């Protein structure tokens, strides 16, 4: 086991991506993947998996603030199931509440409004999701 994990922040137009190391508990953003109504470029995901060879994949689970599911929750679950089904890698879902808010705030502090492009926000959210997963001791 390499201790490498990939995280995805699922969205219908853009899917944020991050790579992290279990040993350091840190993650960094990778370029976001464009999606067509929630359908990603599966060839690109396959290339990412071959390049990084993760032990496990984390997919952000979008929930309402009260913990209830929202319309995007089922689509994120479906995305996670498809990754597992296509590639046979263990996939876990992780609560992503407030990750986008935190990502926007951090990017704005670094570069103002110009830093807030969709792909950067989505991949920064994936970093937050993965680091949160590490912080919870997984």
Curated annotation (Swiss-Prot):
EC number: 3.1.-.-
Gene3D superfamilies per record: YqgF/RNase H-like domain (3.30.420.140)
CDD domains noted in UniProt: YqgF
Record key words, sorted: Cytoplasm, Hydrolase, Nuclease, Ribosome biogenesis
Family annotation (InterPro entries): RNaseH-like_sf, YqgF, YqgF/RNaseH-like_dom, YqgF/RNaseH-like_dom_sf
GO BP annotations listed: rRNA 5'-end processing
GO CC field: cytosol
Predominant localisation class: cytoplasm
UniProt keyword Cytoplasm, yes or no: yes
Pfam families: RuvX (PF03652)
Compartments it resides in: Cytoplasm
Hydrolase keyword on record: yes
Single GO MF annotation: nuclease activity
Listed PANTHER family: POLYNUCLEOTIDYL TRANSFERASE, RIBONUCLEASE H-LIKE SUPERFAMILY PROTEIN (PTHR33317:SF4)
Task performed by this protein: Could be a nuclease involved in processing of the 5'-end of pre-16S rRNA.
NCBIfam families registered for this protein in UniProt: RNAse_H_YqgF
Record-stated family: Belongs to the YqgF nuclease family.
Protein name as catalogued: Putative pre-16S rRNA nuclease
Organism: Escherichia coli O7:K1 (strain IAI39 / ExPEC)
